[in-house]
A protein has these predicted regions:
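Signal-peptide-cleaved, periplasmic/extracellular N-terminal interaction regions immediately downstream
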Residues: 1-66
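Structural motif
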Residues: 38, 65, 135, 244-246
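Active-site-adjacent mobile loop/cap segments within catalytic or ligand-binding domains
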Residues: 41, 197-289
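Catalytic-core regions of hydrolytic enzymes
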Residues: 48-193, 202-214, 218, 232, ...
């Protein structure tokens, strides 16, 4: 029900208020990699408690919010095909088709990050998704490569390296860090504590993104050959929201003449949109988000 962290000169205090009986275990971890000493607390709902938590009631009656991000836009055309096809136009068309398909689902609320040929910074896209309290963020793109024979679809999520460097940027904004920490009051002296919590949140989000991406790849493979059979990971800024599972989908290669031609057709755009929709439905059905 409520979580609060405070610190005095000697102690770090952790308060948890719950409507249900809970059990907990705690243990410490020695320094590893970029992390120092850590305290891990696992909290379990006691089997004796039959009351359904209020949060579960809310989730059951609320819609799953899917943020659909059409890459590039406005002054940023993205990749340009040999025939002059602009990535920003293709991905907006696919995004609108996906939006229309998801709109028909009773338990889903789709959000278009951009619904016209407009320019948005990568961080503006993240902010809009967070403002709408998105449960899943999907950025749609069309790939390009020096190798003109490169083809197929790919799915990427954030890498751990990208996450660690991003955490410092998020913490630079006091309002963002407070919001991401669930409203906990953390002053300037507690940035190290906030960093640990934010890193933990990012790690969980990346793990969720990876699980979701594998399902998405399986569904994309039904309508398109895969360029990468496994999920790719990189430091895409648009995927760096610490609290929203996110993935970037490269639908096909505009740099490949055959795939450029395919990307321009309504049939392929509809097939890709449907595959993404089916992937989202499976992700929800399996309780990943």
């Amino acid at each position: 029900k409520k979580l609060k962290l405070t610190r005095d000169k000697e102690n770090l205090n952790f308060y948890l208020k719950s409507n249900n009986f809970v059990k907990y275990k705690y243990f410490s971890l020695l320094p590893s990699g970029k992390y120092g000493h850590r305290l891990v607390i696992d909290i379990y709902l006691d089997k004796k408690s039959k009351k359904i938590p209020e949060t579960q009631k809310v989730i059951k009656n609320s819609k799953v919010v899917i943020a659909i991000d059409a890459g590039h836009g406005g002054k940023d055309p993205g990749a340009v095909g040999k025939k002059g096809t602009l990535e920003k136009d293709i991905v907006l068309s696919i995004s609108k088709k996906l939006y229309a398909l998801l709109k028909k689902e009773k338990n889903i609320k789709p959000i278009l990050i951009r619904n016209k040929d407009s320019y948005m910074t990568l961080r503006q896209r993240i902010k809009k998704a967070r403002r709408h309290k998105a449960d899943l963020f999907i950025s749609i793109h069309a790939d390009a490569a020096k190798n003109k024979k490169a083809k197929g679809s790919s799915v990427y999520v954030l890498s751990q390296h990208g996450a660690s460097s991003e955490a410092a940027k998020w913490l630079a904004n006091k309002e963002n860090s407070s919001d991401l920490l669930g409203g906990a009051s953390i002053d300037d002296k507690d940035n190290e504590l906030a960093q640990v919590i934010l890193d933990m949140s990012q790690s969980v989000t990346i793990e969720t993104s990876l699980k979701a991406s594998r399902i998405m790849l399986k569904n994309l493979n039904k309508v398109s050959k895969l360029h990468l059979k496994n999920t790719g990971q990189a430091g895409f800024v648009v995927l760096k929201s610490p609290d929203i599972p996110s993935m970037l989908i490269e639908t096909a290669f505009l740099s490949n003449a055959k795939e450029e031609k395919k990307l321009r057709t309504k049939k392929f755009q509809k097939n890709i949109a449907k595959a993404i929709k089916d992937g989202i439905l499976e992700i929800i059905r399996k309780g990943i988000i």
